[in-house]
């Protein structure tokens, strides 16, 4: 029996890993181990490790990075704390392989430690491109330290083959987030209205805006304000805003939204995967710069206004309109989508 350790650092990435975890948990030849770190252990970002436990899984190690995102100096400190603590966790758990997904900076101390411990790394969703964030560099660094690669598209696989200089151990598996639509029974509109205190007769919009980590804090706050200025005054529309990731600038964006919350602008730290996908299926439009607008929303055929450069370089489907972050541009594209 092999110890396969799945490491998760964010609410969104756990949602993508959920059904992979489920399959591993049922394999008689696998001893599943789960490590939760990053924003999962942060009060500011919703203590989302509870979603993992609610799904019936045991978390074998909780690595509190003492995560703070108010300034750039706090994040490297948190990464150093994570590296120290994860080394003790790996020494105790003795994983034969770790499984990680994506491009979050929280993964760097994980894969660095695994590399030093000579633990093979399986990386999901390598080979993608996101030009507007440091995620690109993180993703490629993780790729170079990994032994197994599971890209979502053939296009991404081509990039991996070019980067790695080999064809071996690269398997195109599709986008794991789409599995949830096949496995979940989505909630009804009336159930969502009751849980989120919304008016089911109004139009609903889903908003998720993360910081562009290659831009300044002022730029990111201006982008947020530009979107809010477009949202206010819309008649018969309610917006649900899910808070930004634990990137530099994320805390300030979240504080901005908290200050703007009212009956028609609902702000939540996290909806959880089932409510998030269910709500997405009921909205008139998805606004912001989340990867879910690029991957999951097209599966549902929901219109998307993708703002700014965070997702620049990704494959864009026909239902997605990309625009710059200026208020005039955002307003024009949003109104064209919900009119």
Which ranges hold each PLM region?
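Short internal beta-strands
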Residues: 33-38, 149, 239-244
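Donor-nucleotide binding loops and adjacent catalytic segments primarily
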Residues: 52, 187-282
């Amino acid at each position: 029996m092999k110890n396969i350790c799945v490491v998760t650092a964010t609410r969104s990435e756990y949602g993508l890993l959920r059904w992979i975890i489920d399959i591993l948990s049922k394999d008689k030849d696998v001893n599943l181990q789960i490590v939760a770190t990053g924003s999962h252990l942060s009060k500011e970002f919703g203590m989302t490790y509870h979603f993992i436990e609610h799904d019936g899984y045991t978390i074998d190690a909780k690595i509190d990075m003492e995560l703070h995102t108010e300034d750039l100096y706090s994040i490297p400190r948190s990464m150093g704390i994570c590296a120290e603590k994860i080394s003790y966790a790996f020494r105790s758990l003795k994983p034969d392989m770790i499984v990680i997904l994506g491009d979050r900076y929280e993964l760097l101390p994980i894969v660095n430690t695994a590399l030093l411990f000579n633990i093979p790394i399986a990386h999901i969703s390598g080979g993608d491109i996101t030009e507007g964030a440091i995620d690109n560099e993180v993703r490629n660094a993780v790729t170079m330290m990994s032994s197994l690669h599971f890209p979502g598209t053939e296009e991404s696989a081509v990039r991996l083959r070019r980067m790695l200089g080999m064809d071996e151990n690269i398997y195109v598996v599709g986008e794991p987030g789409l599995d949830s639509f096949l496995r979940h029974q989505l909630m009804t509109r009336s159930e969502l209205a009751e849980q989120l205190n919304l008016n089911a007769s109004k139009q609903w919009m889903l908003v998720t805006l993360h910081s562009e980590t290659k831009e300044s804090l002022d730029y990111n706050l201006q982008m947020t304000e530009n979107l809010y200025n477009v949202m206010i005054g819309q008649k018969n529309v309610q917006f649900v805003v899910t808070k930004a990731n634990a990137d530099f600038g994320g805390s300030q964006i979240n504080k901005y939204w908290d200050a703007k919350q009212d009956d028609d602008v609902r702000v939540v730290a996290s909806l959880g995967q089932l409510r998030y996908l269910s709500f997405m299926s009921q909205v008139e439009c998805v606004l912001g710069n989340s990867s879910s607008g690029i991957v999951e929303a097209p599966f549902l055929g929901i219109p998307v206004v993708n703002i700014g450069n965070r997702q620049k370089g990704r494959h864009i489907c026909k239902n997605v309109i990309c625009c710059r972050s200026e208020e005039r541009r955002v307003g024009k594209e949003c109104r064209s989508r919900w009119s």
